[in-house]
Curated annotation (Swiss-Prot):
Similarity field: Belongs to the papillomaviridae E1 protein family.
Keywords, ordered alphabetically: ATP-binding, DNA replication, DNA-binding, Early protein, Helicase, Host nucleus, Hydrolase, Isomerase, Isopeptide bond, Nucleotide-binding, Phosphoprotein, Ubl conjugation
The protein's name: Replication protein E1
Gene Ontology terms, MF aspect: ATP binding; ATP hydrolysis activity; DNA binding; DNA helicase activity
Source species of the chain: Human papillomavirus 37
Top-level taxon: Viruses
EC number: 5.6.2.4
Biological processes, Gene Ontology terms: DNA replication
Length: 609
């Protein structure tokens, strides 16, 4: 037998740690004669207990399974908490690397109250801190900076995200760099969608190359740029050409400066703070500050001497009243809003905003404008009133739309024109027109268009229980009561006969004494034909009725076929001015010479003539 197993590797799990190959040696003796001997011997053998016929025993397999499951569970927990574990093999490679930690190492609480005077512990802490700082600096110096700048920016963002309050950290960095608080220069916008032209922006850890490039790239977006770089903070004052929201400003700067949103703070500047304006004005003279463009108006207002003198102008109520009168503003909300918008260009409006009695001024202004308008209306004839209202109508229309609609309702236009002439001149017992008929015939559309162009008033009978529901009749040249029902006809028949006769009536006014007036021309629409009602026989001579029997027509696009617009009525009055017996405005205007508009302000001594 020979040993040929040298250098052969075997599986250690195959029972034995060693393996032997036994090779039998051949014998010349034949076994043919010994076969009988072999059979006679049978199952006899010299080896005892070669085969184990006893029952098998399970052994300790359950313990083995528990050990395997425990090892697997510990491995999973280790993977989940791997950032809290350190590999001993890696730490043993370098003691210096082992001393560096990202998270702060807090002292054990049991040593907080260790008995000591404090001097020795202070020295120990100082030595430990110095040693740790030196080791970190040495490792940083020995290491090479990453080539990828994106990785550096990502590291800055991660450092910011580790802070519990990123905004507070940026505000502290800003005050440390510029010596003034960021919120002292700005006012706060709660919503990121509110638009403003001027924005104060500060950024953290921006590359110098990108800051230099932004000076040119922002020129196309801004009328004024103010820039100062005090590492690691950078401060911008950007006056955009158009209003932008905070979201839009963030997207623009993130694209130009390659920064994350967490690195940016943006708020609009304080426009009325003199200290804030001086910060930007004096800062622009600093050689380290880049400024491009003309100063914004709000900086000029706070810093220049001529603007300061204009700021001292006292508020003049008559100027505000003149503005509201010229622009036909009667309601208090319209006066307040539109006059406040003039603060950028008008010194008196700016003084109005700085006054503490704005609400009182608005009420008094609206009251005075109503007084002037009422006096002007009473001084005008119906011809002058119609001419004045037609002057403000822009665009061109055609008078034939009115004529065609009247004829479409089977009304003789010559008769309608004659009645309409008496109606406009407020002739007694002819100053009330009724348009009746079934629904959807255009009654309200026709009368509302006339009321709109002549700036008339609409009365609602729903308020008839109030003593003042007829008060608008004192402030108009023409009025309308739409959709008159039986109840309203009964009220007119009982209480308004004298008014329809053209006589003076006593009208109750709110917060004022009752006044004596004549009713202006009155338009009525109804679904009832009172001419066939015997109970209203006393109104037959006071009301002129026209029937609208046909439904108002619409084309295939659901648009009206008759254009009852302001332009159509303007063309109608211009075309039929003489037929309506309206006076010539050149005669009333002193042979066509221009008349000076109403002036409710005192002329300045050195003013223009």
């Amino acid at each position: 037998m020979t040993d040929d197993t040298k250098g052969t590797k075997f599986d250690p799990k195959e029972g034995c740690s060693d393996w032997f190959v036994l090779e039998a040696e051949c014998s010349d003796n034949s076994l043919d004669g010994d076969l009988e001997k072999l059979f006679e011997e049978g199952n006899d053998t010299d080896i005892s207990d070669l085969i184990d016929d006893e029952d098998t025993v399970q052994g300790n397999s359950r313990e083995l399974l528990c050990q395997q499951q425990s090892e697997e569970s510990e491995q999973q927990i280790h993977l989940l908490k791997r950032k809290y574990f350190s590999s001993q093999e890696i730490l043993q490679l370098s003691p210096r690397l082992q001393s560096i930690t990202i998270s702060p190492q807090h002292k054990s609480k049991r040593r907080l109250f260790e008995g000591d005077s404090g001097l020795e512990l202070s020295f120990n802490e100082a030595e430990d801190f110095t040693q740790q700082t030196l080791e970190v600096q040495e490792v940083s110096a020995s290491g090479s900076e990453p080539a990828d700048q994106g990785a550096k920016g990502l590291g800055i963002v991660k450092d910011l995200l580790k802070c519990s309050n990123v905004k507070a950290m940026l505000l502290a960095k800003f005050k440390e760099a510029f010596g003034v608080g960021f919120m002292e220069l700005t006012r706060q916008y709660k919503s990121c969608k509110t638009c403003c032209r001027d924005w104060v922006v500060t950024l953290y850890a921006v590359q110098d190359e990108l800051i230099e490039s932004s000076k040119q790239l922002l020129l196309q977006h801004c009328a004024y740029i103010w820039l100062q770089h005090m590492p690691p903070m950078c401060l911008y004052l950007l006056c955009f050409n158009v209003g932008k929201s905070r979201e839009t400003v963030f997207r623009l700067l993130m694209n130009l400066l390659q920064v994350a949103e967490v690195q940016i703070l943006a708020e609009p500047p304080k426009l009325r703070s003199t200290l804030s304006a001086l910060f930007w004005y004096k800062g622009s003279m600093n050689p380290n500050v880049y400024a491009h463009g003309e100063y914004p108006e709000w900086i000029m207002t706070q810093t220049m001497i001529n603007h300061q003198s204009a700021e001292a102008t006292q508020f003049d109520l008559s100027t505000m009243i003149q503005y509201a009168y010229d622009n036909d503003l009667i309601n208090e909300d319209e006066i307040a809003y539109n006059y406040a918008k003039l603060a950028d260009t008008d010194a008196n409006a700016r003084a109005f905003l700085q006054h503490n009695s704005q609400a009182r001024f608005v009420r008094e202004c609206a009251l005075m404008v109503r007084y002037y308008k009422r006096g002007e209306m009473k001084d005008m004839s119906i011809s002058a009133w119609i001419h004045n209202k037609m002057l403000v109508v822009e665009g061109e229309g055609h008078w034939s739309d009115i004529v065609k609609f009247v004829r479409f309702q089977d009304i003789n236009f010559i008769r309608f024109l004659d009645v309409f002439k008496s109606f406009l001149h407020n002739t007694p017992k002819k100053n009330c027109l009724l348009f009746y008929g079934p629904p959807d015939t255009g009654k309200s559309m026709f009368t509302m268009s006339l009321i709109k162009v002549l700036k008339g008033k609409v009365l609602s009978f729903a308020n008839y229980k109030s003593n003042f529901w007829l008060q608008p009749l004192a402030d108009t040249k023409i009025a309308l009561i739409d959709d008159v029902t039986h109840v309203c006809w009964d009220y007119i028949d009982q209480y308004l006969r004298n008014g329809l006769d053209g006589n003076f009536v006593c009208l109750d006014l709110k917060h004022r004494a009752p006044c004596q007036i004549k009713f202006p021309p009155l338009l009525l629409t109804s679904n009832m034909d009172i001419m066939k009602e015997e109970r209203y026989r006393y109104l037959h001579s006071r009301v002129h009725a026209f029937a609208f029997p046909n439904k108002f027509p619409f084309d295939s696009n659901n648009k009206p076929q008759f254009r009852l617009t302001d332009q159509s009525w303007k063309s109608f009055f211009e075309r039929l001015w003489k037929q309506l017996d309206l006076s010539d405005q050149e005669d009333e205007g002193d042979d066509g010479h221009t008349q000076r508009s109403f002036q409710c302000t005192a002329r300045e001594p050195n003013g223009h003539l």
